[in-house]
Amino acid sequence: MSPSSEVSAEQPIGSQIDTAPAERPGPMRIEGRYARIEALDPVMHADTLWRSLKDDTSLWAYMGYGPFADERSFAVWLDERVILLDPFSYAVIDIATRQAAGIVTLMEIRPAMRVIEIGNIVYGPSLQRTRAATEVQYLMARHVFEKLGHRRYEWKCNALNAPSRRAALRLGFAFEGVFRQHMIIKGRNRDTAWFSMIDGEWPARKAAFERWFAPENFDETGRQRVSLASLNGLVSGG
């Protein structure tokens, strides 16, 4: 006898949802007020990325690669990255300088589940703690939910990486826990902290970003009046 298709009223199950897959990420160009995101191209971006990233070796402390001894080894690494579809790599252009100043990727791509992760984020010192850096995260989240059609957007990091954990909360990701002994990176143990944002949360997160970016949220010196973390209501828990 085949199992019944009927489910007992006493047995809790998930709600039924549309099973159409999400789109896969690919080449794109998204222009913001402070930053532009475009597909990583070693010919266009290698030189300015190297100049942006070469002096701060701490950028690579929690990564599975880097730091790089010279521009040649960095360029070889970029060449290897751009042939991959997962992760799919993008360059971050600082509109103020028109120079590539960082890299982000979309990775762990599962279209059937409509789940995707943002990761491998490397911002040069000139991009860190700027409105451009925050705008990149807004533009990527908007693209993931509104263009690609994902229902879950993930952020994962080494559990020891306190700045990344703070950034995830500030941006509106919810802390979900730690996977112990999850990976071995550069010969060292990595416990991984997991964060997520889901499609039902995105309208409120989007509104928080847009309120934060509003000109009236910054004084004449450029200092924020209300923090993005406060607007998101996620200032603890990870």
Predicted regions and their residues:
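GNAT-family acyltransferases
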Residues: 1-130, 143, 147, 188-193, ...
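Conserved beta-strand-loop-alpha-helix junction that forms the acyl-donor binding cleft
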Residues: 155-164
